[in-house]
C-alpha cells in the first residue's frame, strides 16, 4: 500500500507520513492510485454535502468549494496559475514558456484565471446543490486525477529530473491502462455526457501542451486537473 500513501501525501493536504524516501519505482506505481485519491476526495465532498443539507445553497456551495481546495492544498491551482502566466507570456515560444512557468511569482493573468475558475466552479456547485447533488460529487475529483494518470501514460515529460520524471519513467503502463478503463466505465455510468465533455477537454489540452512544449510538466498536469474538474461540474450543472 506504500504507493497509495505516496499518492495521498502528494495530492492532498492530509497528514500522511512515509517511512523514509520512497524509491523511484514506488513513486511511479503511486500514479496508479491517483484515481483512488480522487474517489476519496469525492466521498469526503459527498459526506460534507450531506451534512450541510438545509444550509442556504450559496453557503453550501461555498463551503464545499472551500473543502475541495483545502483537501488538495491548492496544489493544482498553483499549477494552473503558473501555466496561465506562461502560456500567454510565452508568446508561443517553448523555452520562454518553460522559463516563465518556473517563476514563483504570479502575474495578473494568473490571478484572473484563478478567479474565473473558482467563480465558475462555485456557481456550478450552487446549481448542483439546488438540484440535490448526490453521487455526482464523486465524478470531478475522480476524473481530474485519473486524467493525470492518462496524461503521464501517453505524454512525454519535458523537464528532466524530479518527481515528474520518476512518475513517467516508472509507471506500470499495462496496469495503468486497466485502471483507466475501469475509471472511464465507472464515470460514464455516473456522469454520461459530462464525462465525454471531460474527455474532449483532455484531448484538446493535451494537444496544446504537445504543440507548445512537446509534452507535459507538473504545472501543466495540475492545470489539466483543475480545468477538467471545472468541465465536469459545469457539464453536470448544465444538465449534460
Swiss-Prot record:
Q: Taking the first listed entry, what is the main subcellular location of this protein, grouped into a coarse class? A: membrane
For the keyword Isomerase, the answer is: no
Reactions it catalyzes: alpha-ribazole + adenosylcob(III)inamide-GDP = adenosylcob(III)alamin + GMP + H(+); alpha-ribazole 5'-phosphate + adenosylcob(III)inamide-GDP = adenosylcob(III)alamin 5'-phosphate + GMP + H(+)
**Cofactor(s) listed:** Mg(2+)
Query: How does the record say this protein sits in the membrane?
Result: Multi-pass membrane protein
User: Which compartments is it annotated to reside in?
Assistant: Cell inner membrane
User: According to the UniProt entry, what is the EC number of this protein?
Assistant: 2.7.8.26
Alphabetical UniProt keywords: Cell inner membrane, Cell membrane, Cobalamin biosynthesis, Magnesium, Membrane, Transferase, Transmembrane, Transmembrane helix
A GO cellular-component term linked to this record: plasma membrane
The answer on whether this UniProt entry bears the keyword Magnesium reads yes
Residue spans crossing the bilayer = 31-51, 62-81, 109-129, 133-153, 179-199
Question: Molecular function terms in GO for this entry?
Answer: adenosylcobinamide-GDP ribazoletransferase activity; cobalamin 5'-phosphate synthase activity
Q: Which InterPro entries match?
A: CobS
GO biological process, alphabetically ordered: cobalamin biosynthetic process
* Pfam families (UniProt xref): CobS
Q: Which pathway features in its UniProt record?
A: Cofactor biosynthesis; adenosylcobalamin biosynthesis; adenosylcobalamin from cob(II)yrinate a,c-diamide: step 7/7
Which PANTHER family does this entry report, sorted A to Z? ADENOSYLCOBINAMIDE-GDP RIBAZOLETRANSFERASE
* UniProt cross-references to HAMAP family, sorted A to Z: CobS
Q: What does this protein do?
A: Joins adenosylcobinamide-GDP and alpha-ribazole to generate adenosylcobalamin (Ado-cobalamin). Also synthesizes adenosylcobalamin 5'-phosphate from adenosylcobinamide-GDP and alpha-ribazole 5'-phosphate.
The record's family statement is: Belongs to the CobS family.
What is the recorded name of this protein? Adenosylcobinamide-GDP ribazoletransferase
Q: Which species does this protein come from?
A: Pseudomonas putida (strain ATCC 700007 / DSM 6899 / JCM 31910 / BCRC 17059 / LMG 24140 / F1)
